[in-house]
UniProtKB/Swiss-Prot annotation:
Residues annotated as signal peptide: none
Catalytic reaction list: (2R,3S)-3-isopropylmalate = (2S)-2-isopropylmalate
Example of a GO MF term: 3-isopropylmalate dehydratase activity
Species of provenance: Paenarthrobacter aurescens (strain TC1)
Subunit structure: Heterodimer of LeuC and LeuD.
Protein name: 3-isopropylmalate dehydratase small subunit
Record-linked NCBIfam families: leuD, PRK01641.1
EC identifiers of the protein: 4.2.1.33
Length: 202
């Protein structure tokens, strides 16, 4: 997973509250067996409306989503995070996230930054009055900058550390690779062992 320290990109104002995971990615797209290629599924129902924000330039090139409260509610589906990332989003700002969505985001390298609703309102105004304005998201200082708005955001220390280090679940496990190898070396031969990684032919 790529480490996240700072990101600067076009902000996308999504004046919607209670955006659930079925709105982020409809269930029909969950039949796919891959982890990539979900950009077409992001907000699929809403994107049928030509006036939807992601159908308008320059917002269609945005990488920082600024949403209303209670973003990512509903069923737990990692596909919601995959769709946001595949479209090109690096961070989502909201005053409140569903716990499961926030957890899935941190594990997949998408920053879910909790920003006070008053600051979200100010950022929305900047983005709507000046389309194409970029937002700088700084995970080191835990701040966002948009025009003349500078606001702090909240994120738990553990998720922040994982994002800064670029550690997904596999990366965390591989930090203990030497210990795992040493343990398996002492196990009886008839017990299961970790298979070596497959090397693809060039």
């Amino acid at each position: 997973m790529e480490a996240f320290t700072t990101h600067t990109g076009i902000g996308v104002p999504l004046r919607q509250s209670n955006v659930d995971t079925d709105q982020i990615i409809p269930a029909v797209y969950l039949k796919r067996i891959t982890r990539t290629g979900f950009e077409d599924a992001l907000f699929a129902a809403w994107r049928k409306d030509e006036s939807f924000i992601l159908n308008q330039a320059p917002f269609n090139a945005g990488s920082v989503l600024v949403a209303g409260p209670d973003f990512g509610t509903g069923s737990s589906r990692e596909h919601a995070v995959w769709a946001l990332k595949d479209y090109g989003f690096k961070a989502v700002l909201s005053s409140r996230f569903a716990d499961i969505f926030r957890g899935n985001s941190g594990k997949q390298g998408l920053l879910a930054a909790q920003v006070a609703q008053d600051d979200i309102e100010l950022i929305w105004k900047v983005l709507e009055n000046h389309p194409g304005t970029e937002i700088k998201v700084d995970l080191v200082s835990k701040t966002v900058e948009c025009g003349n708005v500078v606001a702090p955001f909240e994120i738990d220390d553990y998720t922040r550390w994982r994002l800064l280090e670029g550690l997904d679940d596999i990366g965390l496990t591989l930090q203990h690779e030497a210990d795992i190898t040493a343990y398996e070396a002492t196990r009886p031969s008839f017990k299961p062992k970790t298979l070596p990684a497959k090397v693809q032919a060039q």
